[in-house]
A protein has these predicted regions:
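N-terminal low-complexity or simple alpha-helical regulatory segments
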Residues: 1-102, 137, 148
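Alpha-helical bundle regulatory/interaction domains
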Residues: 67-177
């Protein structure tokens, strides 16, 4: 129930659909804690990310949809990611044979970091499928936190290798794509 999830928080109902809406880090922490408590699903970040189509990101999403290549869309996302939020920074670079999308926390999110990281990675994955529906899924995921207890239930659904306790949270895929 949206009303119950937002009760007492400085968040307007329906703001998730507004590309201009902003949420402070403190409000995000309170909301993420409540979301997990209400759903009983600590992996809710994966579902949240999957529910955000490109169009939910306003002009940035539409610009990505009009990009000629996935590389162009990623370049736009990195360049303008800060217009969507300031809690994390998105960085893209090539490392050997890998193209890397890296999330850098701009302030410590502690126990709430996994929810944000997982929702962003899920969102990026499904937006990539919107842009290139026929692409084979190759790559790996790296997370800068220990493996959560709930992850053993998710692992079979994720078609790429997954690593925890890494230096950074990254999505990696073959650079030639």
């Amino acid at each position: 129930d949206e009303q119950e999830a937002l009760a007492g928080l400085d968040i307007e109902p329906g703001c998730w659909r507004d590309p201009k809406a902003r949420v402070t880090a403190l409000t995000f922490k309170r909301f993420s804690r409540r979301l997990v408590e209400l759903t009983g699903e600590p992996w809710i970040g994966w579902e949240l990310g999957a529910s955000m189509p490109l169009s939910s990101h306003g002009f940035l999403g539409y610009a990505a949809m009009s990009s000629n290549t996935l590389g162009d869309a990623i370049e736009l996302a990195v360049k303008f990611f800060r217009t969507r939020g300031t809690i994390v920074q998105l960085e893209a670079f090539v490392e050997g044979e890998w193209a890397v999308l890296q999330l850098n926390e701009m302030l410590s999110l502690g126990e709430h970091g996994p929810l944000l990281t997982e929702s962003l990675f899920s969102s990026f994955h499904f937006m990539g499928l919107q842009l290139m529906p026929d692409i084979e899924i190759l790559g790996e995921l790296r997370f800068a936190y220990p493996e959560p207890a709930y992850f053993s239930r998710l692992r079979p659904m994720i078609p790429v290798p997954i690593y925890f306790d890494c230096a950074y949270s990254q999505m990696r895929f073959p650079a030639e794509r």
